[in-house]
Amino acid sequence: MSTVVLVGAQWGDEGKGKVTDFLAEKADLVVRYQGGNNAGHTVVVGDREFKLHLIPSGILYPDKICVIGNGVVIDPAVLIGEMEALAKQGISTANLKISQRAHVIFPYHQRLDQVEENRKGSGKIGTTCRGIGPAYTDKSARIGIRMADLVDEEVFAALLEQNMKDKNHLFTRVYGLPPLDYGSVLESYRGYAKALKGYVTDISIIINEAIKQGKNILFEGAQGTLLDIDHGTYPYVTSSHPVAAAACIGVGIGPTRINRVIGVAKAYITRVGEGPFPTEMKDELGDYIRKKGGEFGTTTGRPRRCGWFDGVAGRYAVRVNGLDYLAVTKLDVLSGLEKVKICTGYLYHGDILNEFPASLKVLRECVPVYDELPGWQEDISGARKLSDLPANARRYLERIGEVTGAPIALIGVGSRRSQTILTAELY
């Protein structure tokens, strides 16, 4: 039996979907523990590409139980759309389980997200405007509506009526917008409730029972460590906790039940939206990496900002998550470069910082200190074991391990499931 938590070790978009898909082969359950449809996974199996936002990547295996935990906020229209899209490709969602305690996203959350982002102007966060933040706000304010409420027709109608009364007061009096129609929202969400009711259950019982039975469980986080509401580059963060500790809270298990934590990082680093980015490439090389790596958001289509691998941020992710291993993806994107760089520290007003600062003012003024290593020209997309990689590529990986303090257990050399090198047993 092994319980493995898979987390993003950067600003999200690290390739967690591919790694989850690869590791799901030996898992009995695959569990999503936080976030919403502001995150996206792209998984390539054979000649087919799957883009998932809420459903765990393990759904592509017919014998896996896939779970959406209570830490997730759910847009039921998006979830049902994903289920229907999978069905059209012959993928069953019969093994999907949804937590009764997961909170629901409503049209007023999405509208609030949009109007607040517009109001902030140049001070905007860079939200996806999917309603994620406002849904988590309602959850913390104890006025949210959960899946257990949604599937109870009488309870749901009363809760929605009160929430929409409050939100419409805000829209009309503060923002000068017309009110949302209660009747149409009620009708739509009653339809969603009927479609999803059979999937809604107490997932904590299912997962704890699976642990007792000695099954392998893979917990997958969305976004990444540097977007965590507490540990990320606040306020340019998400509204939930992508870090490993949140896996326990987000599904209803105790911390002693976790056996291993794996962090996923690209061989370089990217971020979407606003916020400081010390190793960002603001030149033609950044454009080259973006195009070669296909660095455009799965959810928004926005171009991602690209930079050299940040070892300071990597060490931070290892520390706050307690990472046992790193999985390094997209190593193939760096093939063909004469030189490759790894940031080992930050120069700040004449001092070297070896740890990731909390202050955005400090982070914005940090200048990366690089180790420069020779690149490799070979096509590595066909490599299936470590010895298949060129010596310079192996040295680059070794240096990442040295700088971050975490051994590398998995290497991605392409987008397909088969384009993976495993160097350690993870279950």
Curated annotation (Swiss-Prot):
Substrate binds at T298, T299, T300, G301, R302, P303, R304. It is an enzyme of class 6 (ligase). One of its GO terms (biological process) is IMP metabolic process. Binds 1 Mg(2+) ion per subunit. CDD domains: AdSS. One of its GO terms (molecular function) is GTP binding. The active site is at D13 (proton acceptor), H41 (proton donor). Pfam families: Adenylsucc_synt. Keywords: Cytoplasm, GTP-binding, Ligase, Magnesium, Metal-binding, Nucleotide-binding, Purine biosynthesis. Its EC number is 6.3.4.4. Belongs to the adenylosuccinate synthetase family. Plays an important role in the de novo pathway of purine nucleotide biosynthesis. Catalyzes the first committed step in the biosynthesis of AMP from IMP. This is Adenylosuccinate synthetase. The lineage of its organism: Bacteria, Bacillati, Bacillota, Clostridia, Eubacteriales. The gene is purA.
